[in-house]
Amino acid sequence: MSYLLFMDESGHDHKSMPYEVRGGVSIASVNLFKIIQDIQKSEESIFGCRLSDFKTEFKGSKLLEKERFKWAKQDDPMDDDARCKGVRRFLTAHLEKRNPIRSDFTAYGQASLKMADTLFNLLFKYNAKIFAAISPKGMQKPQAYEFDDYLRRDHIRLMERFALFLEENREDGLMIMDQSERNFDKKFKRQLSNYFLKTRTGQKQAQWIVPEPFFIESDINYMVQIADLCIYAINAGFRCEKGLNEPVRTEIQERYEKTLQALQYRKIDTRIIKGAPKQVNIYGIKYTNSPYLSKK
């Protein structure tokens, strides 16, 4: 058995999101097909169709967009039949050259939040773990920065936590990433390779993490879409760690922050602090306020 870490990123375009977040969801390979089957069944029962048939997907930026929260609460909860019919009317409106009516918007909003809730519940069901590296948006590199071909400090901490998890379970791990802009992906792959092959810490972690990531398109992979949901929710609504002071979307925080806390990897580890051993909590979601290395 091995563990697959499905990864995505949020905020690296430096536009509307408050932080830069990279990370994802780890799940045992033996549970992968089971959770995918459950996702497909849930999608059809909640929306009444496959979203891919209408060229859309359940990424976090879509399921949890502000408008869908607004639509969902504008009327009482719908029963399953009414919701599915409303969703279909909503999705086919542009094909039929008509405007959706109020109840169609309500149905689509309620279905979106119900799907997000269901996906998080499935992560609990299959004992998935969340790992994420958070850093300030738009941090500038120091002048004459020498380590652009190596991982940033926040990404090193992400690898450290995934490696600890794998070592604890005595299993190896694969990274499967959402394919984005080609040059951006090539750079991150090069940084990973240098980290795992040229640094002592990376070489040690390569005993557990396969150093070569795989890139796939999110619109054809359910698990990368779930990773996107988790990373988006962390960026917009997770403020549990010291230093996370940027504006928060309260509707996401109130609905999912405790869920994200519970799903993140956690380990009690012994570290040498000021010359003495001390037990510390290691969490899968980690904020780094200064991500650029000063030395290798």
Question: What are these regions, as identified by a protein language model?
Answer:
Residues M1-K296:
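Phosphate-ester processing/binding pockets and catalytic centers
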